[in-house]
Amino acid sequence: MSIYELFHYSLFLGLFVAFTYNKKQPPVFGAALAFWCILLSFLGLSFRHIPNNLSNYNVLTANAPFFYQISGTWSNHEGSISLWCRILSFYGFLLCYRGRPQSHNVSKRGGHRETLFYSFVSNFVKNPILSLPRYEQKSRAAPQLYTPFVLRTFVDSELRSRRNRTFDGPALFYVYAPLYPERKMSFAPLGARLPVVRGEGKRMSLLLHLARDDKERASSIDEQRIDGALGIALFFSPFLSASSDPFVRNFFVRTEPLAESNPVPQDPISAIHPPCIYAGDVASAMGFGLCRSKMMNGIVALHSPPMRKDAAEKNGTLFRSAGCVGSRITSELFTLKFKHVGEKCYPALLLRSNRSPLMLLRRRFFALSSLWTGALVDTGREQAKRVVRNGKKDTTTSPLCWTAGANTVVSDQDQEPIRIWILTCRWFLNVGILLGSWWAHHELGRGGWWFRDPVENASFMPRVLATARIHSVILPLLHSWTSFLNIVTLPCCVSGTSSIRSGLLAPVHSFATDDTRGIFLWRFFLLMTGISMILFSQMKQQASVRRTYKKEMVMARSTLVHLRHSARAQPRPVMLWKN
């Protein structure tokens, strides 16, 4: 077995690793192994071009300079696809290296809010599956129930130091449905034990999946990102091995070259131009994979069955929730009990005795206005509020509400890798198109005609889409446009490649006219576009359904703000009305 056959077998080894890398621990190991295998195969192909090994099918000339012998590796269809796979494996290695488990984009403070969010969902479907820790008192006081969100947000530092102290009244809060005032509903509090309904097995399993630990959930998201980005390699590696094998040998022995070297493409700019275009196109594949995994994660994690419209109509209620700050658990179901109040009473807002109704209205208006301006939406940032204590200014950081939106599990830091790959794509495409235009101007002498060449048009369309993606990723309100443009850019690159390599378009310097290869690329283009559009349409449909809960979200967020201030001041509960 010659050394060239070893290089050929390393290509299949890289293909095998590309199929099984997800089972490696950590994932960066599998991505690195696939990258080195494909790099070894590409170097073996280059070693066939440099010594003018005429036994290779793609080596036609023997008198080209050394620099153009190297560039001859990607000057044919098989070599260009091999370079495409090598760049793709390198980008995948960078993505796995940046997405290691210790650098997850799930913030700690977001995890606490997610716990409260899942508790909200569990109360909404009357299946409280979250078993929160009980902080038993060492004294004779009754046991109390806390959530991590309450411990960090609702309860002040001074109040947390003496959390074993009971309140005069309960801090349990209910949000009743004004659409169905005739229905009386009772809900279990956070952590209460209720029998599990067998008919809701799927719903329970999904919520259990959502209520996992932060590290486990972050690891799952990380695997989805890597799987979405490197899944493109599962197509190009078989395509390279099956229909575009660069290591095909001649059936006869050649001692003389079949053709003389063409002096026209022998230009340094022409040799650098194709790798830049390939690097830009493959960078769009990384953005495509990240957005695809983000859409799939958003459909699973954010649009669960309890959040659907039919579930809301079935239960006939808005978001019903309970936030326990320090109430007693008297039975399996919570009942509101107020001191010096009759037995029959309706739940009401906790009102501070030292606060006027005007102050409450101002606070409620602030909550509503902040919601429309985006201040209440959790984007991983917290608003600093100036607090004057004992005559000194103290800057404390306090979130205004819990997350209930498009990024419950993944914070806005997830946009950073997408932004990096968009900039990488646009930069390489700019350099490649600029070099190609310069070479055409001083070599062909046709100037602007170069941009009417189908090959350059195929690379110019992703560049325009990359410019649009930069503008959409900068604005935080255009997440759907960012996802849509990312899933459109890669099919645009694949469609241009398939049109040129199938012979549908005949450019000046085309080197591939095989119809079977073009049909293979077209099938991949249709499959990828169809799956992406289905995912995007489902995401938009679920987002449109979620807009119907805007009023309910306003109520829940504003009441949480009020509950936080009430918990800090240890209010004396006052009923607004009673029977």
From Swiss-Prot:
GO cellular component: membrane; mitochondrion
One Pfam assignment: Cytochrom_C_asm
Main location: mitochondrion
Subcellular location: Mitochondrion
Entry keyword annotation includes Mitochondrion: yes
Keywords from the named record: Cytochrome c-type biogenesis, Mitochondrion
Gene Ontology terms: biological process: cytochrome complex assembly
InterPro entries recorded: Cyt_c_assembly, Cyt_c_biogenesis, Cyt_c_biogenesis_plant
GO molecular function: heme binding; heme transmembrane transporter activity
Superkingdom of origin: Eukaryota
Function (record text): Could be involved in assembly and maturation of cytochromes c. May play a role in guidance of apocytochromes and heme groups for the covalent linkage introduced by the cytochrome-c-heme lyase.
Family statement: Belongs to the CcmF/CycK/Ccl1/NrfE/CcsA family.
Name recorded for this polypeptide: Probable cytochrome c biosynthesis protein
Native source species: Daucus carota
Lineage: Eukaryota, Viridiplantae, Streptophyta, Embryophyta, Tracheophyta
